[in-house]
């Protein structure tokens, strides 16, 4: 498993180009199930979750060509199937459930995996699709679903789940009649999915609002689509720039998608200039503490609360970070403790008493966003860090090390077999590692 070797306490200057959003690309890939024609997706990042999604497409009988950053998916040879190992590796694999039921009427799917960040049940997906006429049961870790034609109706979600909203939108496009989704997610990625489906011939109204109306059609056709920029990648670089100081320009993003993040970072002392599809962030003075409560969009993203905790470690004062979306998203806390952070967990709240530079340590990336938080912590620490188990980080960040180096970060990715020097250097950065930890 690869590790990141980081030297810290250095300001960042330069330009970063933001990739297409992982959380937009994945549902777009599964949209290819809904048509027998070719779907062309542009600006696709080569990250492990995308590769996993394409393995699922292959298991379903589909094929694809990937040239540069353009992906062509051919769904004409797809068929009902049983998907096991790839589904177990990625949470978003559940998004093939609705399209498969809509087009083929059956699918068997291993219960999805992904980051371990608390309870992430699939009950909203099952409840919504069952209301459309699907029969779904779980046997020995396999989700078995069938439907003799899905039927529209009104579905009220108990929580505005992004994944459940996306699954129901895709299923509704080929259902009989009109489907109304109440308390739908309003995230930009949901709007991007609706934009693609409309180009494919779907009849969708209300994207970006809390109630969606979808009229089923006889079939969808292929098209070409460029997913929206990754607001979480952008927010990660914004937080990193604020934590380290300096001035960073972010290109190919949508500033409107980052209002909650920009507002909170400015409260901490960052200076942000918004342009049409760019953003400049700089921080010259002292960081100030701020409280954060993660909420569904347009609130502060749950996918950025771990990174904000890393920033809060060096901000003067006490920050309280509450995640209202995932109750167990605190895997970064024990790792930041290894670096000397004054941080504690109280139920859903993470309390950070900041004000000084973190020390160095060898830490483990327990999930995607916690891994990003540890990189930010290492870059802003006085002694840097070694971040192990980088496979989680690879799931969601494209060329992260290369992009960080371009703005002056001293970071090196070491593959297995190249890690001798990093491990020998742990007297400096790994002194806080407890005995017996592998």
Where do the protein language model's features map onto the residues?
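Short, structured segments at the rim of ligand-binding sites
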Residues: 1-438
């Amino acid at each position: 498993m690869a590790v990141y070797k980081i030297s810290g306490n250095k300001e960042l200057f330069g330009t970063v180009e933001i990739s297409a959003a992982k959380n937009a690309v994945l549902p777009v890939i599964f949209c290819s199930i809904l048509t027998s024609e070719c779907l062309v997706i542009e600006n696709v990042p080569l990250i492990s979750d995308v590769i996993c999604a394409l393995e699922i497409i292959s298991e379903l009988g589909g094929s694809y060509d990937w040239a540069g950053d353009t992906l062509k998916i051919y769904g004409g040879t797809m068929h009902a199937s049983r998907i096991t190992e790839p589904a177990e590796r990625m949470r978003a694999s559940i998004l093939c459930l609705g399209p498969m039921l809509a087009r083929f009427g059956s699918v068997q799917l291993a219960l999805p995996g992904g980051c371990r960040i608390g309870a992430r049940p699939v009950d909203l997906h099952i409840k919504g699709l069952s209301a459309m006429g699907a029969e779904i049961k779980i046997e020995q870790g396999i989700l078995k679903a069938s439907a003799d034609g899905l039927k529209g109706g009104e579905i009220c979600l108990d929580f505005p789940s992004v994944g459940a909203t996306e699954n129901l939108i895709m299923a509704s496009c080929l259902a009989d009649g009109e489907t109304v989704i109440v308390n739908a997610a309003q995230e930009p990625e949901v709007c991007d999915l609706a934009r693609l489906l409309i180009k494919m011939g779907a009849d969708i109204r209300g994207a970006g609002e809390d109630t969606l109306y979808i009229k089923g059609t006889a079939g969808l056709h292929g098209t070409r689509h460029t997913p929206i920029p990754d607001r979480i990648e952008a927010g990660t670089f914004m937080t990193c720039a604020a934590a380290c100081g300096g001035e960073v320009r972010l290109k190919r993003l949508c500033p409107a998608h980052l209002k909650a993040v920009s507002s909170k970072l400015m409260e901490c002392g960052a200076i942000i200039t918004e342009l049409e599809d760019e953003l400049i962030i700089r921080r010259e003075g002292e960081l100030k503490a701020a409280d954060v409560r993660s909420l569904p969009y347009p609130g502060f993203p749950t996918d950025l609360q771990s990174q904000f905790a890393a920033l809060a470690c060096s901000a003067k004062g006490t920050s309280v970070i509450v995640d209202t979306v995932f109750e167990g998203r605190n895997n970064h806390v024990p790792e930041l403790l290894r670096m000397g952070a004054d941080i504690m967990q109280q139920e859903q709240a993470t309390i950070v008493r900041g004000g000084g530079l973190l020390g160095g340590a060898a830490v483990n990336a327990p999930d995607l966003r916690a891994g990003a938080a540890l990189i930010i912590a290492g870059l802003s620490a006085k002694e840097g860090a070694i971040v192990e188990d980088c496979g989680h980080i690879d799931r969601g960040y494209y060329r992260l090390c290369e992009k960080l180096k371009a703005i002056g970060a001293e970071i090196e990715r070491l593959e297995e077999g190249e890690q001798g020097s990093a491990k020998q250097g742990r007297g400096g950065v790994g002194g806080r590692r407890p005995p017996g930890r592998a």
